[in-house]
């Protein structure tokens, strides 16, 4: 019998509340399938939060007539475009799980500094009201990816120095047009990078544990 929508929501919430194992061999051990399920759920949640925040910022501060031209100018703005990471699902399927985990970790870690300023910028919105927890959510996903890497690491050379730059902090001066455009660009990159990390994790989960949700 198929699970009801309510049961599915409860299961997803329960998985999000599960802690990561602190070390390999910890008892009781969490199955690899659960590690992947947790990581995917956390990445999906962060990606959706980033997308909602981007849209709300856009509606609040960016005139509709300027959005298209600004979005085109943002194409080469993201530092993550300088690393040899897959740009979509098809390319991701050509990479090993270890490579995808390393790229995911790099993307997440590049935002740990900037997002600490997010709550200082956005204070008057239901969406922005959750921004003070984004850092905690990113750290949680970082720990989950590191747990997966401990399980799958094959001893091959690490890729931890590929992304030497991180992103600038968000600008709190919302009366400045330059600051608004900077924040708009940062939110665009944040959304794109979390979409990449989510895609990589879903590709890995689907090819290891074939399931109906693999079509994305």
Curated annotation (Swiss-Prot):
In its keyword annotation, does this UniProt entry include Metal-binding? Answer: yes
| Domain of life of the source | Eukaryota
Pfam family, any one: Hormone_1
Q: What cellular-component terms does GO give this entry? A: extracellular space; nucleus; plasma membrane; secretory granule; trans-Golgi network
Q: Name one GO molecular function term.
A: hormone activity
Q: Which SUPFAM superfamilies match?
A: 4-helical cytokines
* Entry's family note: Belongs to the somatotropin/prolactin family.
Q: Does the keyword Signal apply?
A: yes
Q: Which organism is it from?
A: Canis lupus familiaris
Q: What is its main location?
A: secreted
Record's keyword terms, sorted = Disulfide bond, Hormone, Metal-binding, Phosphoprotein, Secreted, Signal, Zinc
Q: Which residues carry this modification: Phosphoserine?
A: 131
Protein name, UniProt field: Somatotropin
Q: Which residues bind Zn(2+)?
A: 45, 198
């Amino acid at each position: 019998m198929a699970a009801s929508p309510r049961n599915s929501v409860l299961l997803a919430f329960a998985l999000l509340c599960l802690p990561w194992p602190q070390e390999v061999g910890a008892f009781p051990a969490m199955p690899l399938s659960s590690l992947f399920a947790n990581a995917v759920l956390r990445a999906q949640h962060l990606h959706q939060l980033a997308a909602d925040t981007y849209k709300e910022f856009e509606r609040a501060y960016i005139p509709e007539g300027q959005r298209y031209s600004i979005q085109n100018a943002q194409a080469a703005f993201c530092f993550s475009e300088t690393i040899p990471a897959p740009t979509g699902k098809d390319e991701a399927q050509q990479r090993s799980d270890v490579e995808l985990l390393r790229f995911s970790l790099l993307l997440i870690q590049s935002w740990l500094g900037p997002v600490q300023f997010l709550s200082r910028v956005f204070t008057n919105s239901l969406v922005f009201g959750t921004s003070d927890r984004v850092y905690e959510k990113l750290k949680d996903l970082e720990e989950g990816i590191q747990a997966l890497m401990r399980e799958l690491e094959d001893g091959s050379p690490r890729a931890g120095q590929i992304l030497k730059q991180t992103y600038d902090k968000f600008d709190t001066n919302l009366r400045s047009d330059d600051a608004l455009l900077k924040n708009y660009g940062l939110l665009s990159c944040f959304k794109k990078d979390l979409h990449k990390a989510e895609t990589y994790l879903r590709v890995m989960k689907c090819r290891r544990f074939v399931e109906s949700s693999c079509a994305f």
